A protein has these predicted regions:
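Non-heme Fe(II)-dependent double-stranded beta-helix
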Residues: 3-11, 16-72, 78-175
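Non-heme Fe(II)/2-oxoglutarate
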Residues: 12, 18, 23-25, 53-55, ...
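Glycine-rich nucleotide phosphate-binding loop and flanking beta-alpha elements
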Residues: 84, 183, 260
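Active-site region of the double-stranded beta-helix
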Residues: 150, 175-182, 193-202, 208-211
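A short secondary-structure junction signal
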Residues: 156, 170-173, 187-188, 199-206, ...
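A short beta-loop-beta micro-motif enriched in histidine and acidic residues
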Residues: 175-185, 239-240, 246, 268
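Short, conserved beta-strand element in jelly-roll/cupin
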Residues: 182-198, 245-246, 276-279
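Double-stranded beta-helix
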Residues: 198-258
Length: 318
């Protein structure tokens, strides 16, 4: 009932009721995903007719991803990497923008590591032309559109450094198994901006664990908790555990309702950019992203795509 009321509240006031995400977790713990499908279908916006893709940094001659694989497994690798120039721009950005080390915002210094994870502010990221270009990319938008079978909303960009700091996997750095539930339906596209191998923190997923009735009630009854490798290993076949490695510039899309985690780093540092898409904004109430320095092309794009960019707050755009 509370989530239903929040749906009505969202349509009137353009935000969810407080603690809607907690209510979603409680529902998920009870029905193992059935209600999420209902609310997604209730709130989703009819998708537009597919047109020829023109605005993209990728080559146009083949699809970036297998929609069937993404639906079946809960994740899928993109067939093309980001070009070297774009990767270099993003890496440079990660050395010139300040990031949060758990106590304060600092420039990342690999010679002075004090935490497992260094997070960049989404409002800083949204105002960078290299990230605006990816947000506008029609190939990436179409991945979310296909997965939702509806028009997507861009939720937020996220970027962070991971380090080998500490002796045990960090819950705060998402290095224990968990699932995400801030929206009723969402998709994340992850870009590795450094080479990622067994030593420096590959993502791990439990294949197909995004599906209805895919999670054991014994784990769901714990609520929104991190789960150790040993405990979760009691419930899934070893073949279901997948490790995603890749060279810098490689990317994959994932429904992080799957059980997933980042592996603890042994050496080196890992830089990841994540683009978040949602079918609706029901769930956690994040502040709208403050766009202060849009490029001319980003201004025009946002004017033409007001639904996709409804989570943005523009300053002096018009």
């Amino acid at each position: 009932i509370y989530v239903s009321l929040s749906c009505v509240y969202l349509k009137i006031f353009r935000k969810s009721l407080k603690n809607t995400n907690n209510a979603l977790v409680n529902l998920y713990s009870i029905d193992n995903g059935k209600t999420l499908i209902f609310f997604h279908n209730t709130l989703k916006t009819k998708r537009l007719k597919k047109t020829k893709i023109s605005n993209t940094i990728y080559e146009n001659h083949k699809p970036l991803i297998s929609a069937e694989e993404l639906n079946e497994k809960g994740y899928a690798k993109l067939s093309q990497n980001l070009n070297t120039n774009h990767v270099n721009e993003l890496v440079k950005l990660a050395t010139t923008l300040k990031c949060f080390n758990g106590e304060k915002f600092v420039l990342f210094d690999e010679k002075s590591i004090t935490n497992t994870r260094y997070n960049f502010d989404s409002n800083d990221l949204i105002n960078q032309s290299s990230i605006q270009q990816l947000i506008m990319d029609e190939y990436l938008i179409d991945i979310a559109r296909e997965y939702f079978d509806s028009e997507p909303i861009f939720d937020m960009p996220v970027m962070w450094w991971s380090t080998p700091f500490g002796n045990v996997p960090s819950s705060n750095a998402a290095q224990l198994y968990h699932y995400d539930l801030e929206r009723v339906k969402w998709l994340k596209i992850f870009f590795y901006l450094t080479d990622v191998n067994d030593s420096n923190g590959p993502h791990q997923y439990i294949e197909k664990s995004h599906k209805v009735n895919s999670k054991p009630i014994e784990l769901l009854s714990k609520g929104y908790k991190r789960i150790s490798d040993d405990e979760i290993g009691n419930y899934y076949n070893i073949d279901s555990f997948k490790v995603i490695k890749g060279l810098k510039g490689s990317a994959f899309a994932a429904d992080t309702l799957c059980w997933h985690k980042g592996t603890k780093l042994i050496k080196g540092n890992r830089l990841v950019l994540e683009l978040n898409y949602a079918s609706s904004l029901l769930g956690t109430n994040h502040e709208k992203l403050k766009v202060k320095t849009p490029t001319d092309s980003f201004k025009l794009f946002c004017k033409k795509n007001s639904f996709y960019t409804k989570n943005f707050k523009f300053e002096k755009l018009y």
